[in-house]
Amino acid sequence: MQHPTNARYDFKTIESKWQKNWAENKTYSVTEDEDKEKYYLLEMFPYPSGRIHMGHVRNYTIGDVVARYKRMRGFNVLHPMGWDAFGLPAENAAQKNNTHPSVWTYDNIDYMRQQLQQLGLSYDWDREMATCNPKYYRQEQQLFIEMLEKGLIYEKVTTVNWCDTCQTVLANEQVIEGACWRCDQLVHPRKMNGWFFKITDYAEELLADLDKLTGWPEKVRTMQRNWIGKSTGLSCDFQLEDMDDKISIFTTRPDTIYGVTFMSLAPEHPLVEQLIAGTDREQEVRDFVKEVLEDKQRQDPTQEPEKKGIFTGKYCTNPFNGDRVPVYVANFVLIEYGTGAVMAVPAHDQRDFEFAGKYKLPIIPVVVPEGEAVNPADMEEALTNHGLLINSGDFTGMASQEAQAKIIAYAEEKGFGSPLTTYRLRDWGISRQRYWGAPIPIIHCDSCGIVPVPIDQLPVELPEDKDKSSVCAPLHQRPDFINTTCPKCGQPAKRETDTMDTFVESSWYFARYTSPRHTEAPLDKAKAKYWLAVDQYIGGVEHAILHLLYSRFFTKVLRDLGYLEIDEPFIKLLTQGMVIKDGTKMSKSKGNVVDPHDLISEFGADTTRLFSLFAAPPERDLEWSSEGVEGSSRFLNRIYRFITANFEALTAGEAFPKKLSEEDRLLHRKNHQTIKRVTENIEHNFHFNTAISAVMELVNQLFAQFKNEKSIAAPAVLRASVDSVLLLLSPMVPHFCNEMWMVLGNTEPIENQAWPEFDIEATKEDLLTIIIQVRGKVRSKIQVPVDIEEDEIVALALADENCQKFIDGQPIKKTIVVKKKLVNIVI
């Protein structure tokens, strides 16, 4: 125990000291302990781009505070970190810098790990993983094979972006305004084989289990419900004229089916080619389809394109009324949704209404508001609400909801339709024609067909390039990788050259953290059972659908493969706000980026952490403020000065007084009120900003104990409050609090201490503030004892000098007392 003599807190020396201590002692390494309640805290792992940004600082600091708090509450805390390391940016950087993606990636990981350690984050670095490591994706390849054997993976032809100049497939991210990012030549769609995960097999469970996720923001659950998009309605076939084929449609509004006046097909619909083959419209329709597909590449996905279509020259028949219905190809029909064919009812669908107006197609109202007549010529927009049916055969006069059920039953009875439940969700296409991804463990044999790579031959590794000219060349351009032997028949065969979507790696990494060095299987079942599910997951709302939905899917698959016993991966989810400056998100293009490295160098990690926690609640955006950072630094130095100025009193070792003076009682009460407020703010909603504010009030109270530079509170009462300040702030500013804790003579680091408990009796105030109203208007306030009777409060209120002015001798009709809050005097 040594009296600190520096005028200011030396953050550089102290932070380096404690970071070294934590690393050498593996302070935050953890193993399973059946005698302790586990708590698994996880933030979404980062892509190793090269440097952390303020969004990382905020996200990871929030998680670190929770992890440190839970440790002090006695939990066995798992708090791991790793790297989502595959992806397109590494390929781009490797080509730009004439290096290999693995070199670029691991260099970035080394630098970013150092940055995270400089923030004082309490990670179990023994569990660190990079998804580009063959030891990681070897287990992923085994999962692929097990899913294939269970019927959860299949191969089919799909449409991709193709560049003729580069002779390669491009990811959507590589297509810029319809052109190849590399050669700037026009990209066009091409059909190719691709691998798919059957996520639709789990659509109903994924939807139903959202109701279990009560610890998730409702916004995220709603987004997933909408993405899964369950619909119930009618599946119905429209027979094509002069052809054996039928057009199958699905509609959620069977009550409008008598109003069909044309049929719309997606440009990619397989029937389009059959409809136009050998007709005088063949070339015109093909040109239109080509134009629409190219326009799709260029268009802004947030903008609604102009509706365009072309008549195929063919007709189909409405099975309900026998109407002859022209068949169009339309740019607003998507092959991914429904059947890729839409029965068009312009009177009751706005897109169809606009299309019909443009191409002079009939508009036939069949559902109208009760008691109203509708003239199609007078319609300015589609009638989309339910109502009563007209022009609908035997169903005329029925209400929409009643008619829907009867129309479906009629179609089923007649054999041209049936009830159907559909989902907007589509199977997950995981094939990527990139180099920097996990190879798909499949061999193609002319004799045996599709053959999984034997488990004992995993991993299928990416080829390493000695020739830098071939860095990142797609696998289909590498004969040394492609050519192999069939494990079944021993004949020459070829490897699959697609790699997996990088979302695959991030869909199960949280489970792998429970046994990251396990080599016998993707997961150690016993360890997974102990740690999972994740108790608290933290990340941006931009991942609400894809990553979070895929992780839920993988959890259910891992359960069905026998690895897990849980249904959902994340019990609670916090989607933190962005860090913004000048009203917009920080970005290089806007020139408003604040580099955490510079901030830590100037102010230290603890100040950086404190600002990121104090400036806003975690779920809201944080507005950058230089003044806020400086204020956080001043606050820590204020505590430091208090401890150094009162070092002798704080380390005197006096016993806590049996009888408290008035000053002691005030400080003691404030101390326990602060413990209560901070505990509740962290425990209930992670509102660290109000928790820090409460500690600031306690620090102010500490300074208020001094008159003429001498404490009027007993040293032991003073020390108890200072201990609370350090304990309560330690999850937020761990270096500073550890150092001050040891300076005050403690022998064990602060993270080994229990979280302070509050005495509920000690938090209670002696006096209440009662508001006095006269005729409902506030006229005065009085202080009264907590245990005062109501009639005594009324007497004091009536005697109050300010109230007397407003009563002015008038007779009092009655008094109304709201317990412990106010008295209203009615005159």
Curated annotation (Swiss-Prot):
Record field: catalytic activity: tRNA(Leu) + L-leucine + ATP = L-leucyl-tRNA(Leu) + AMP + diphosphate
BP terms from Gene Ontology: leucyl-tRNA aminoacylation
Localization: Cytoplasm
Keywords assigned: Aminoacyl-tRNA synthetase, ATP-binding, Cytoplasm, Ligase, Nucleotide-binding, Protein biosynthesis
SUPFAM superfamilies: Anticodon-binding domain of a subclass of class I aminoacyl-tRNA synthetases, Nucleotidylyl transferase, ValRS/IleRS/LeuRS editing domain
A molecular-function term among this protein's GO annotations: aminoacyl-tRNA deacylase activity
EC category name: ligase
Assigned GO CC terms: cytosol
Protein name: Leucine--tRNA ligase
Protein's organism: Desulfotalea psychrophila (strain LSv54 / DSM 12343)
Gene: leuS
